[in-house]
Amino acid sequence: MESLKSPVFLLILHLLEGVLSESLIQLNNNGYEGIVIAIDHDVPEDEALIQHIKDMVTQASPYLFEATGKRFYFKNVAILIPESWKAKPEYTRPKLETFKNADVLVSTTSPLGNDEPYTEHIGACGEKGIRIHLTPDFLAGKKLTQYGPQDRTFVHEWAHFRWGVFNEYNNDEKFYLSKGKPQAVRCSAAITGKNQVRRCQGGSCITNGKCVIDRVTGLYKDNCVFVPDPHQNEKASIMFNQNINSVVEFCTEKNHNQEAPNDQNQRCNLRSTWEVIQESEDFKQTTPMTAQPPAPTFSLLQIGQRIVCLVLDKSGSMLNDDRLNRMNQASRLFLLQTVEQGSWVGMVTFDSAAYVQSELKQLNSGADRDLLIKHLPTVSAGGTSICSGLRTAFTVIKKKYPTDGSEIVLLTDGEDNTISSCFDLVKQSGAIIHTVALGPAAAKELEQLSKMTGGLQTYSSDQVQNNGLVDAFAALSSGNAAIAQHSIQLESRGVNLQNNQWMNGSVIVDSSVGKDTLFLITWTTHPPTIFIWDPSGVEQNGFILDTTTKVAYLQVPGTAKVGFWKYSIQASSQTLTLTVTSRAASATLPPITVTPVVNKNTGKFPSPVTVYASIRQGASPILRASVTALIESVNGKTVTLELLDNGAGADATKNDGVYSRFFTAFDANGRYSVKIWALGGVTSDRQRAAPPKNRAMYIDGWIEDGEVRMNPPRPETSYVQDKQLCFSRTSSGGSFVATNVPAAAPIPDLFPPCQITDLKASIQGQNLVNLTWTAPGDDYDHGRASNYIIRMSTSIVDLRDHFNTSLQVNTTGLIPKEASSEEIFEFELGGNTFGNGTDIFIAIQAVDKSNLKSEISNIARVSVFIPAQEPPIPEDSTPPCPDISINSTIPGIHVLKIMWKWLGEMQVTLGLH
């Protein structure tokens, strides 16, 4: 049975939780409502695909229900259908559902370049993911032998997405040493199976007998895989291998394998997946059901033309700080460039009342855009009635279309204590409201409108040189348009000039963009002198000046030349800003994009806000970019953060194209804006991107009628960056609100060093331990810690639970380096304390100058393994064997490096990744 409308207007308050995910999902009486599964623009029309999606969710719901102790099930799902597909009577217009906030994206290829199911997740353990990626072939059941049934795999990915748990297998190293014996990485450890040698040639693999232990390393030799037995008694764990028939549960505290070197142990402090799920808000607000849940219902929604109404404040306070004119400058950019061709746009202004400046007009030409620009307000007076503006905008939209799925861009600088009176109307409208708070006095309730409708919330101060207002409007591309239609910001900068000074610089137009390129310049008093040259040195003419609005713009015809576009702008005693935007040069070549994310839209001091920027070209991550966040407070103070992709501090995974940093420099309560700058340069070497962490398990093989059968080799995406990258991007990251910041200066130091997450250990000889890690800071990942506490134990659980009483290592002479630096430290184990086969676990805690301590680091592990002696070789035998060097990397727990010389000299090195 299908419901014709998606009840998205009910899915409101959950959006207050945070913004790592823009999901509309709400948990209502144990059922997940508002799930959005979007079929990407590149997927050819295929009605069977819709049925495949329905079948997967319908079959997954009871599996999820039983796996979670009768707590959760899938209640209703909206399937978002591309505009290019043929319209049908059962397809209705979306409300708040967009491709941008989709929970599941169905695309012809996954971000891995193949059919592997995968979940985007950039946050910490327990934080929600961004979205799940599936392919049509996977949904059609064409990958059953590689990934297992679609419904079970979907529940596996749902756990990544909704509860922030991680895989309990290891795709890179499938075995580890425990008490001197090799064990398959699995959870629970009660899962039984065969250790088989897999031989692959071309596109097929066969089994080649039982695995053999390497007498030097203690691990199995290369090409050994663990193949689970078909009949098991163990019910866990879904995050290990949900394809095993008996597996219907998550690992719990009782059966969790804490020693296994997997991401769940590494990222979640050895906790089981069920322990993490139990700490989620979902779990806390539910109790087990006593009856079976109903089957999911589905709504089929088809994307249509974009419908936008500008709702602009022209009250008396807009005279302050030239706000009315600045609003018109930013609105001009939106109308000229940001809003996509073919969109319908209207305009309403408001003070104490509201006024229709333009009914909905379709933008099919430059003349259509210019006509709307002429309706921008020129006079400001009166009070502020935000609800009047919204009601009038709904009326304007309803004259042409239903308000479902329409958008409102609401800008205001004033207080309005009646704004909550139209909240119900907004919820019922099905419209998405983007809010722009201008200046320090904008209504504090303003963000509620964007939060309850899934819109973008932005903030601009009156510091004109930061160009925040233009950035806010530049960020308002459609959440449903294909990326090739999006306006992409290449540059945004401003400067205060004196005495005929110049603003000089260059903008990079890379090969992925160049269409509809626009240079927009604003000033505050008199028109400046403007020079722009293309990469060939040809001066550009054709600037259009509007001295009333104090803006000039140049639209580059055709596709802009690739290279450096230079500019020189001269002025005196005023502020200039420059904004450059463009679009994809080709519909077939994805443009390089920057997607900013903050982990919360309300930050309560002293909890830090985490700023992320994902830089990609299509599905491929962009590495080694220079990425900076500019964060501006309500006081006008700006803080510049270098975002890093180093796998330390706020950054979860090294070299995945996601750049991260903690923000702790709060100076006041109120709004903070976020802006990202990204610059790519020449790469001097081939840099390999890290594979995504939350991939579905590829099944190496299975047992059928007592025989082991092997799958073809796992499809691998190299993600090798082997070309020069030269690009520039700017993007607004929206805004967040800080609360609980102390009013009195100086603000107390309440921020400890961040957790060390990349501790690695190795042992040389029989007693020299080498440690490496990335230095934390005094305040999370900023500054310099004061000292380190290093402790060790032969019990991984004791070290975690009783760190303060574990054996402490002498760290005399260890002086912490600046945050993000590499730390190296060596210490000796005492005498013959640890015998052969002993596992030694090591962890670090950082301490700052206020004696605030970080969380305990990830736990590094070394194992003392002494190979059996070979019988002596007679003197008349062949010459001694040459040196042997063996390296085996085990991400998540240990790096094993063994060097053995025939003369009896031995080095055993084990360390943690």
From Swiss-Prot:
> Principal localization?
secreted
Q: Which SUPFAM superfamilies match?
A: vWA-like (SSF53300)
Q: Return one Gene Ontology term, BP aspect.
A: calcium ion transport
Top-rank taxon: Eukaryota
- Looking at the record, the residues that make up the VWFA domain are 307-476
What are the boundaries of the region Metalloprotease domain?
46-199
Tell me the leader sequence span: 1-21
**Triggers of expression:** By IL3, IL4 and IL9 in the lung. Increases in the bronchiolar epithelium of asbestos-induced fibrogenesis. Decreases in cystic fibrosis knockout mice.
A single MF term (Gene Ontology): intracellularly calcium-gated chloride channel activity
Q: Write out the annotated subcellular location.
A: Secreted, Extracellular space
Residues of this chain annotated as glycosylated in UniProt:
N504, N770, N804, N810, N836, N887
Enzyme Commission number(s) of this protein: 3.4.-.-
InterPro entries, per the entry: CLCA_chordata, CLCA_N, CLCR, Ig-like_fold, VWF_A, vWFA_dom_sf
Q: Name one Pfam family in it.
A: VWA_2
Tell me the protein family, please.
Belongs to the CLCR family.
Q: What biological function has been recorded for the protein in this entry?
A: May be involved in mediating calcium-activated chloride conductance. May play critical roles in goblet cell metaplasia, mucus hypersecretion, cystic fibrosis and AHR. May be involved in the regulation of mucus production and/or secretion by goblet cells. Involved in the regulation of tissue inflammation in the innate immune response. May play a role as a tumor suppressor. Induces MUC5AC.
Domain remark text:
The metalloprotease region is responsible for autoproteolytic processing. It can also cross-cleave other CLCA substrates.
Query: Know the name of this protein?
Result: Calcium-activated chloride channel regulator 1
Per the UniProt entry, what species is this protein from, by scientific name? Mus musculus (Mouse)
